[in-house]
Curated annotation (Swiss-Prot):
<dbReference type="GO" id="GO:0007283">
    <property type="term" value="P:spermatogenesis"/>
</dbReference>
<dbReference type="InterPro" id="IPR012677">
    <property type="entry name" value="Nucleotide-bd_a/b_plait_sf"/>
</dbReference>
<keyword id="KW-0694">RNA-binding</keyword>
<dbReference type="GO" id="GO:0003729">
    <property type="term" value="F:mRNA binding"/>
</dbReference>
<dbReference type="GO" id="GO:0003730">
    <property type="term" value="F:mRNA 3'-UTR binding"/>
</dbReference>
<keyword id="KW-0810">Translation regulation</keyword>
<feature type="domain" description="RRM">
    <location>
        <begin position="47"/>
        <end position="128"/>
    </location>
</feature>
<keyword id="KW-0963">Cytoplasm</keyword>
<dbReference type="InterPro" id="IPR000504">
    <property type="entry name" value="RRM_dom"/>
</dbReference>
<dbReference type="GO" id="GO:0045948">
    <property type="term" value="P:positive regulation of translational initiation"/>
</dbReference>
<dbReference type="GO" id="GO:0043565">
    <property type="term" value="F:sequence-specific DNA binding"/>
</dbReference>
<dbReference type="InterPro" id="IPR043628">
    <property type="entry name" value="DAZ_dom"/>
</dbReference>
<dbReference type="InterPro" id="IPR037551">
    <property type="entry name" value="DAZ_RRM_vert"/>
</dbReference>
<dbReference type="GO" id="GO:0060965">
    <property type="term" value="P:negative regulation of miRNA-mediated gene silencing"/>
</dbReference>
<keyword id="KW-0221">Differentiation</keyword>
<protein>
    <recommendedName>
        <fullName>Deleted in azoospermia-like</fullName>
    </recommendedName>
</protein>
<dbReference type="GO" id="GO:0010628">
    <property type="term" value="P:positive regulation of gene expression"/>
</dbReference>
Length: 229
């Protein structure tokens, strides 16, 4: 960088993104920051902060007021189960340029609990459209986005909140379900009962064979033999 020359913001972000990619190439797993934040694979969302360790009783307005001292908050999204119970993490969207890394490096506590902060990572999905002869181009169906947890053990995935866009955010921390709540992980399989039917042999089989003189007549799937004299 030449001294006295100010680079555009887009170029600086590009250099920062390349630096992250270099770190990822050196590590077989996801990049882990100094505060324990595991940076998963994906695209970093600007001016968006991941907030983990949220108390179940905290609402979005309290989070908005708390982070307003770091910049103008545009929106706060707390991820919840279908029943409305908080999963313990969420996202803070700032309406202005904010240095997310400066916020992440600070030991921030909220209501006596230390928050787990990190940049929001957005994973791009291929928006393949499903076409059909019965469906026009304007009625194509896009795949449903889902939340992905990079710390869950293999074979175990928590229920995922659905966003209204074509992208998905990934959380770097794993959170257990609240007491008394059980979420089925494997869909139930229903076995189909098989019935065996025995059909009686026709009288003309075996030793009692009848020589057919004329053609056979088929009526409603039942073969009837008519012998014309």
């Amino acid at each position: 960088m030449v001294q006295g020359v100010q680079l555009p913001v887009c170029l600086i972000c590009g250099l920062y993104s390349q630096d992250i990619q270099k770190h990822r190439q050196g590590f077989p797993s996801s990049l882990k920051l100094s505060n324990g934040y595991i940076l998963p694979e994906g695209k970093m969302t600007p001016n968006t902060l991941f907030v983990g360790g949220i108390d179940m009783k905290v609402d979005e307005n309290e989070i908005r007021e708390f982070f307003a001292k770091y910049g103008s908050v545009k929106e706060v999204k707390i991820i919840t189960y279908r029943g409305g119970i908080c999963k313990g993490y969420g996202f803070v969207y700032f309406s202005e340029d904010v240095d997310i890394q400066t916020i992440v490096d600070q030991p921030i506590s909220f209501k006596g609990k230390k928050l787990k902060l990190g940049p929001a990572i957005m994973k791009e999905r291929s928006s393949r459209s499903v076409s059909s002869p019965m469906i026009g181009p304007s009625q194509w169906v896009n795949p449903t986005p889902y939340m992905y947890c990079s710390c869950c053990p293999p074979g175990l995935a928590p229920p995922s909140p659905v966003f209204s866009g074509g992208n998905q955010y990934m959380q770097p921390y794993s959170y257990s379900s609240p007491p008394g709540i059980m979420v089925p992980q494997v869909p139930m399989n229903y076995a189909q009962t098989t019935y065996a039917y025995q059909y009686p042999l026709p009288q003309w089989c075996g030793e009692q064979r009848t020589r057919l003189v004329n053609q056979n007549f088929v009526d409603c799937g039942v073969q009837t033999l008519l012998t014309l004299m």
